């Protein structure tokens, strides 16, 4: 999203582009980590380097959650794609949308299908590829 020029991006589940040492918290870029052989280790303390992503049983970033909810509340249009909307808390974010243009794109049905103004049951990759091809 950032590479496409989006200014307000809330990475609720984190990003592999940021990495840090689990022991001393030194930051590492994705390029630095990818250049390492084997398990990535910190050059400062020898600790294991972990991507800044949320793993099972880890807490989500509250600022990212609150920012996401507020952005959804203020959105003129909400496009949700490639998710069954079954995993919470992110699945519940759709309920904060108060606008009148909800677009759902997913291969299978979701519990929010009945609220969608535009519903597409297909692969998000296929739908977006077709949209780009038609726009060009």
Listing of model-derived features with the role each one plays in the protein:
Residues 1-136:
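Conserved catalytic alpha/beta core of Sir2/sirtuin-type deacylases, generalized to analogous enzyme cores
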């Amino acid at each position: 999203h950032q590479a496409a020029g989006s200014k307000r991006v809330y990475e609720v589940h984190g990003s592999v582009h940021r990495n840090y040492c689990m022991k001393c918290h030194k930051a590492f870029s994705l390029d630095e980590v990818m250049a390492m052989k084997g398990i990535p280790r910190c050059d400062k303390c020898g600790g294991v380097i972990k991507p800044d992503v949320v793993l099972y049983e880890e807490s989500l970033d509250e600022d990212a959650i609150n920012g996401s909810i507020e952005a959804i509340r203020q959105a003129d249009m909400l496009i949700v794609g490639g998710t069954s909307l079954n995993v919470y808390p992110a699945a519940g974010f759709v309920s904060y949308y108060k606008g009148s243009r909800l677009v759902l794109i997913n291969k299978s049905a979701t519990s929010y299908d009945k609220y969608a103004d535009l519903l597409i049951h297909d692969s998000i990759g296929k739908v977006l590829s077709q949209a780009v091809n038609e726009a060009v």
